[in-house]
Amino acid sequence: MDASFDVVVLGVGSMGSAACYHLAKRGMSVLGLEQSSIVHEFGSHYGQSRIIRKAYFEHPDYVPLLKRSYELWNVLEQETGTRLYTETGLLYAGRKDSMLMKGVRESAGIHDIPIEFFDFDRLKKVYPPFSLHPGHDIIFESGAGFLEPERCIEAHVEQAKISGAQIRSHEKVLGWAKSGSGYEVTTNKGIYAAEKLVLTAGAWIGGLLPQVSQQLKVTRQTVFWMATKHPDLFSPERFPCWLAETENSGDVYYGFPNLQAGVYGPLHGLKIAQHNPGQVTDADSVDRMVSAEEKDAMRAVMEEIFPGEYAGLLHTKVCLYTYSPDEHFIIDVSKDDPNLIFAAGFSGHGFKFCSVVGEVLADLAQDGKSSLPVQFLSANRFL
């Protein structure tokens, strides 16, 4: 046995880095194992920016977790002196009776979240590049914006190390097994003992927890960065994040302001992607080439929402979503083993929560329960 720990965290990405941070801050001995580099482009967290919002159309039960998440991101910014969150506001647009727009109104009403209703004259005055369907509702949430995911993960990892955690990258977990009251974890570099395990392996969790993998599907998602003819109109100081249904297909797309390379990571341009599930795939064999057809389709979306602004394609990336059957998270303790904790199935809307999910996972590892309202995310829905 190479070393023993109170907790070993398998997967140090979005959720795992936050779990290591919270566990180590509580004085527990922690080992975080990551098969790739700490920040990498193979999973779900890469890509410069992630929207964070409170008028949560997916379900109002998420809003208390979001409020806590905002608090924790602010704490992490203060601890590190690093910018992690930029407030730009968020524009929602879609049919009045769509899940998107009904959900925004419901969460805002239940949880008293400030939102504004825009008409088209107001939209064109405040954000002139937009051209949205005249029959669609438009809602603006001022207290929304975006996180920088790579910086967030690096901040969690560095603060976890300061609190005593050991974080090991490029170390692949080959398997784990019960050993007495705890566990034995085998990697390509060693064998470790743990009293408790936290599994946060994202799209790779199926190989570590087969009973959960049966409830999950991994999808291939494409992301695009476009050049615009008037980039100043799209700067973070003048332009919001957005979620919008298209007129032609009714699919939901999302995007960000024009982010400058060097200021916001290595990429630049107007980032746009589709929020709907992509093609089902495998994390290890996903096609990471973006086809000409996919590029043409996204250009058409760009020209529908921002007519006359397309000035070329700058970058493309492929990332992974891991969907649960109902597209809500799975966060729980194994019903067969109180020392096995897992988080999975974040379904393309999880990153904004990783600060609070890390806190919940630390609660579950330390006490077997959390005071935060996560019962609706229990694995009992499926298992």
Give the residues covered by each predicted segment:
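Beta1/beta-strand and adjacent pyrophosphate-binding region of the FAD-binding site
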Residues: 2-13
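Active-site substrate-recognition segment that forms the wall
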Residues: 21-25, 81-85, 191-192, 196, ...
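Dinucleotide-binding Rossmann-like beta1-alpha1 core, especially the glycine-rich loop
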Residues: 49-126, 135, 253
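Helical element adjacent to the flavin cofactor pocket in flavoenzyme catalytic cores
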Residues: 141-196, 200
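Flavin (FAD/FMN) cofactor-binding core of flavoprotein oxidoreductases
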Residues: 121-125, 146, 280, 292-355, ...
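Glycine-rich FAD pyrophosphate-binding loop
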Residues: 24-45
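N-terminal Rossmann-fold NAD(P) dinucleotide-binding loop
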Residues: 16-17
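Short beta-strand to alpha-helix junction loop
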Residues: 64, 92-100, 140-159, 287-294
